[in-house]
Amino acid sequence: MALRGFCSADGSDPFWEWDVSWNTSNPDFTKCFQNTVLVWVPCCYLWLCFPFYFLYLSRHDRGYIQMTYLNKTKTALGFVLWIVCWADLFYSFWERSWGKILAPVFLVSPTLLGITMLLATFLIQLERRKGVQSSGIMLTFWLIALLCALAILRSKIMTALKEDAEIDVFRDVTFYIYFSLVLIQLVLSCFSDRPPLFSETIHDLNPCPESSASFLSRVTFWWITGLMVRGYRQPLESTDLWSLNKEDTSEQVVPVLVKNWKKECAKSKRQQRKITYSSKDPAKPKGGSQVDVNEEAEVLIVKTPQKEREPSLFKVLYKTFGPYFLMSFLFKALHDLMMFAGPEILKLLINFVNDKKAPDWQGYLYTALLFICACLQTLVLHQYFHICFVSGMRIKTAVIGAVYRKALVITNSARKSSTVGEIVNLMSVDAQRFMDLATYINMIWSAPLQVILALYLLWLNLGPSVLAGVAVMILMVPLNAVMAMKTKTYQVAHMKSKDNRIKLMNEILNGIKVLKLYAWELAFKDKVLAIRQEELKVLKKSAYLAAVGTFTWVCTPFLVALSTFAVYVTVDKNNILDAQKAFVSLALFNILRFPLNILPMVISSIVQASVSLKRLRIFLSHEELEPDSIERRPVKDGGGANSITVKNATFTWARSDPPTLSGITFSIPEGSLVAVVGQVGCGKSSLLSALLAEMDKVEGHVAIKGSVAYVPQQAWIQNDSLRENILFGRQLQERYYKAVIEACALLPDLEILPSGDRTEIGEKGVNLSGGQKQRVSLARAVYCDSDIYLFDDPLSAVDAHVGKHIFENVIGPKGMLKNKTRLLVTHSISYLPQVDVIIVMTGGKISEMGSYQELLARDGAFAEFLRTYASGDQEQAEQDDGLTGVSSPGKEVKQMENGMLVTDVAGKQLQRQLSNSSSYSGDVSRHHTSTAELQKAGPKNEDAWKLVEADKAQTGQVKLSVYWDYMKAIGLFISFLSIFLFLCNHVASLVSNYWLSLWTDDPIVNGTQEHTKIRLSVYGALGISQGITVFGYSMAVSIGGIFASRRLHVDLLQNVLRSPMSFFERTPSGNLVNRFSKELDTVDSMIPQVIKMFMGSLFNVIGACIIILLATPIASIIIPPLGLIYFFVQRFYVASSRQLKRLESVSRSPVYSHFNETLLGVSVIRAFEEQERFIRQSDLKVDENQKAYYPSIVANRWLAVRLECVGNCIVLFAALFSVISRHSLSAGLVGLSVSYSLQVTTYLNWLVRMSSEMETNIVAVERLKEYSETEKEAPWQIQEMAPPSTWPQVGRVEFRDYGLRYRENLDLVLKHINITINGGEKVGIVGRTGAGKSSLTLGLFRINESAEGEIIIDDINIAKIGLHDLRVKITIIPQDPVLFSGSLRMNLDPFSQYSDEEVWTSLELAHLKDFVSGLPDKLNQECAEGGENLSVGQRQLVCLARALLRKTKILVLDEATAAVDLETDDLIQSTIRTQFDDCTVLTIAHRLNTIMDYTRVIVLDKGEIRECGQPSDLLQQRGLFYSMAKDAGLV
């Protein structure tokens, strides 16, 4: 009554009247309702939003937008609207001034509306000043205002059409103006303003259109349509992709996570300290003795470690990403509430159909409400999904960035516990787990909320009978809990097996050359398959568990429905199961099905993420290197004249291990050249590592003054151009760069490289020789122009004359670095007289230290060492360097032979690629060369010289053959059985629901329904058949998935191992690791799940359409066109989605390749202090990967919104046709039809998601199969051509007009080789760098097949027999000593062919018996990844032991004694002479003195044999061999 007086002066205008607004065929709102509610609703909305929006804008200032026509128009219209509203107000005052009695509403409403319009105008300007280009708040306000005005407009038009209507002309005119202006404001709000001034998007060449998209465009994801169209017309390329939004980049995301993690770690340490302190001072109990107190204190201190609080990574992730992610809570809650509107409207619709007297407009209203509700649900749901996916993407970016940064600083002991495989898995699999969790995590609270709301509405519908359903759900809880615990256990075991497999695959890929040379592929294949078998066992258990889980989860909603209906109809005969109760309940049960089905997935995802969270926390908590353990001072700082000062320092590789270096004390003055010498394993390399802070300093003081450069023993080369390897991130200074190139003897190499210094160097420098890699590594250090240089045997891998050149021009007293402090680890004695100080290492300690003369004078171990090894066998020694022997007191020391033992460790790869077609002839030229000349023009066919092949993305639709391949991998029987069981399950589901509709239409006789028991029994039986078929298809798909995983992995492994070496040189290891980790994980885990969900969604959609057509045949007019629209949109989407997935996969490989490369060279990166640059590179590669991922997730949303709109249309037409045909339809069929249509949207959404997931995930199968089509090497064994088991008996090797090239389009690197090597001959092979020495051995092992001619061993053409038949009969001691993780025995004898006694004998002959006997586990001692727990020299001795064990008739030594000290080298040479006395020995030598007693020497130059004969004869000829011997100081 109060509102009557408010709305009209005489109280005659009611606020609400049912007969006017509801119970009529032509409804309308009352005048009072129009003037109050319809005016106030938009005002209340804006005023409620204003304080929150104002606060948000004040905190999020994006910049200032200049006034535009759009902004000016909106502002002007705002003022006009304010004037129009207040014109109404002044008109009311004017009326009152004329004595007209007006209701208060005519003053209040215009005033409120006018002030609201001023507020709207103020917000338009505030948004402009804060850089808001399009406002959702304002668009919603204008939309609400328009909808309210629309209702008033309809009423005014209806009133105007009445003959006797009273018309208020002024207010009607102002209203029409108001309506028009609001409509214009709404239209203008749909457009976006220009970007703010100084916005980054202005300068971005290809900015993401999202940032400048309008609100409507963002809500409907319309802004990505341009990319979708481009992708539909032609395959997308990486250049088509937009830049990432700034807030999604690594630069923004990673530092925040790292900062929060450091805070959390510091916090946990502080809390730990508090706990420790509190435990030390316990309160003394009354009456207790002091002894009791002390005992209690001891107990507390002992228990303290149990109370250690680990830093919480979950808290850190929440703190970093929580604020943005919390928005998803709001959208999810809104969606969940809207979801229950459907069943309630369905209830009203069924009641409407039953009430034949109800006006038709009510049915249309319910239909419109269903449609609007469904559309809003769609928009809200996909905003929720978008936030979740973006959060997941940011988490993945942050995790990868944090792992990479941590990998650069963890200690060496920590690196042993986290292998490369594990760290790669952290970046690929574990980071992906967090992404997956982001989409599911909200279901933790959402699923229970949905269950509670559903049960509440079911209670209202069916009463206490619902408790039966609740009981069923409660019974399932412990079962789900047990399965979750089991799932976690299996997940941990699975990840452990996967880590081990990836670790082993990494080693295989890094050491593939050695595997091929030794014919060990099968042994390592079996090792990988054994680990894989364990992995598949766990997967199989998980699959069985998943099948049981699927059975319970699918059956639970049906059992809930069955038990509820059964109790409802049996407890009271008067309980009638009519259409309203049954189908509203069924709709609610269907809603209930989703949270119950999704919860197991959520639990599984949480379990997986918790495992990953723990793994990541452990890795990020590893100890870090302490650069502060070494005092670093700038050069300008005084602090004495010493560059390096070490006082009583002790170092260890791990705190738990005994010290590696102890009692180290020395000082090195600025500008000194210091040599470090000693036997293998004495701690020379460790000393350099200690100075680089790579080791733990236990005690002592270390001070370094100035910057440091480091040349490691094994050269680390990046997959980049030669120039970039040398510049190493520094600016090009042309003159200095040329000087470095010349000094490091690289000019001749550049002249033969196809593009000079721009030539691409393969991964790990595969296309450079060991010497070339070492020189590039040296040039990198020299170019950086540091104050202190640490050289770890840099002259080891180069020829004597090149070593001499480098020492003279770079390291020595007259070299480029003569004023720098240089610390040189060396085995060569020829340079020792020229150094300032010599440090002699023995057993991790400095045994002697002093100048060359001082050490000789002391007549200690060093002098004895020199006497033994400095007097060569050649009496006619020439002193090229003019070095004179120095006499020690009372003794005469013979003159040194310059360069007698100049060679050491070679680079990691045996393979020469382009370099072997060249020669290094004569002295290094000293002419000036410009960088333009250094960049030699490549051949016309650029691809001929392109070595590394980037991971390529396939284009176009995934071929049907890929699906067929996967089905064959599963097994055709299991494939078709799965489809049949799926079909049976969904037929049973459809029949059960149709049966329910028939039941609800049963006539009611005397207040009850007949045949209730039969109906219930059949309904139950159909449900049981559903359960059986569900279990059947889950089991079939899971087992089939495991079969497929096994077969695809075996095929991939077999194909990769059967690939020739050229394949591994062209293919970055990141690509291969990607296949064995991420792609295989997709096949293992994702594809079986996607198949189940895809098949389920497909049959659900077909079933829903069948039911709708059955209920309303008229729907056949609409469903086919909607189906066509659906199909077109889906195909339109898949064209882009598929390509985006491929681009994402391709851009993922460089992330892993760069990461692997970084791990291999981490000590070099740290030494040069280049961590920041490498972090930036890693971030850039991750961002490139996310540039492809982000559009793919948005494209998913784009598709879902459009397809759900198609689904919403099905809801609209199903309800509409039910209203139209209500007089001829039963309530049961209407209920069935509409309840199914309500599910269609969800089914369609899932079908499209799963079909696209299917296509995008099947790409993994495509990428695994990709390598089956690559070129393969010759068969390993050819039974019909197998040589006799005793072959070769003599060891005679003949080269007949032999020629070799590395690739078809390259020149020959060996030409017209004609030579016969008789059995038992000892032949040395020498030549300048790149002459083709190693190429000859590669040809002998058929690593590269001959281009012309043939090789005959004991009358058998080696090209005719199997590769393994050949390779097991020849033994090589390679340039690069490669060991694999596993026992020492496995590294010697992987096939377990020899007895322990034979193994020990080989170790004794290789001078390793004492060392191995001293190990805790002897032969079973575990070797670290890459054999890193042995020195390079010890690894080389293990390779010698392998050769001794195999004892074949032909032995090849490829610079095999490079990494050992002089004494060990002497022992090895004598071992080879005695143990291989009756064998044919081919030795590639840098140290010419080792082959001077050989039968013959072959001199190669430019791939041809230039000289051949006995060493003494060749010396007399004074040709190439003579000049090389002269360089080595042998003549």
Curated annotation (Swiss-Prot):
All copies of domain ABC transporter, residue ranges: 644-868, 1293-1527
Keywords carried by this UniProt record: ATP-binding, Cell membrane, Glycoprotein, Hydrolase, Lipid transport, Membrane, Nucleotide-binding, Phosphoprotein, Repeat, Translocase, Transmembrane, Transmembrane helix, Transport
Extracellular side: 1-33, 96-100, 155-172, 338-363, 462-464, 569-590, 989-1025, 1111, 1225-1226
Catalyzed chemical reaction(s): ATP + H2O + xenobioticSide 1 = ADP + phosphate + xenobioticSide 2; an S-substituted glutathione(in) + ATP + H2O = an S-substituted glutathione(out) + ADP + phosphate + H(+); sphing-4-enine 1-phosphate(in) + ATP + H2O = sphing-4-enine 1-phosphate(out) + ADP + phosphate + H(+); leukotriene C4(in) + ATP + H2O = leukotriene C4(out) + ADP + phosphate + H(+)
PROSITE patterns to which the protein is assigned, alphabetical: ABC_TM1F, ABC_TRANSPORTER_1, ABC_TRANSPORTER_2
Transmembrane segments: 34-54, 75-95, 101-121, 134-154, 173-193, 317-337, 364-384, 441-461, 465-485, 548-568, 591-611, 968-988, 1026-1046, 1090-1110, 1112-1132, 1204-1224, 1227-1247
Domain of life: Eukaryota
Region (Disordered): 917-938
Keyword Cytoplasm among record annotations: no
Glycosylation sites: N1006
Residues recorded with modification Phosphoserine: S289, S915, S930
Modified residues (N6-succinyllysine): K503
Record topological domains on the Cytoplasmic side: 55-74, 122-133, 194-316, 385-440, 486-547, 612-967, 1047-1089, 1133-1203, 1248-1531
Keyword Translocase: yes
Predominant location: membrane
Documented activity regulation: MK 571 inhibits sphingosine 1-phosphate and leukotriene C4 export.
Family from the record: Belongs to the ABC transporter superfamily. ABCC family. Conjugate transporter (TC 3.A.1.208) subfamily.
Function noted in UniProt: Mediates export of organic anions and drugs from the cytoplasm. Mediates ATP-dependent transport of glutathione and glutathione conjugates, leukotriene C4, estradiol-17-beta-o-glucuronide, methotrexate, antiviral drugs and other xenobiotics. Confers resistance to anticancer drugs by decreasing accumulation of drug in cells, and by mediating ATP- and GSH-dependent drug export. Hydrolyzes ATP with low efficiency. Catalyzes the export of sphingosine 1-phosphate from mast cells independently of their degranulation.
UniProt name for this protein: Multidrug resistance-associated protein 1
Organism: Canis lupus familiaris
